[in-house]
């Protein structure tokens, strides 16, 4: 399973500005 932190990091890498 992928940790939520990793998911958010991935989103951030994608270009989104969600630094939760």
UniProtKB/Swiss-Prot annotation:
Localization: Secreted, Cell wall
Domain of life of the organism encoding this protein: Eukaryota
Region (Disordered): 1-20
GO CC annotation, single: extracellular region
Key words of the record: Cell wall, Secreted
Identification of the protein by name: 54 kDa cell wall protein
Annotated organism of origin: Arabidopsis thaliana
């Amino acid at each position: 399973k992928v940790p939520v932190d990793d998911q958010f990091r991935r989103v951030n890498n994608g270009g989104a500005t969600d630094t939760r």
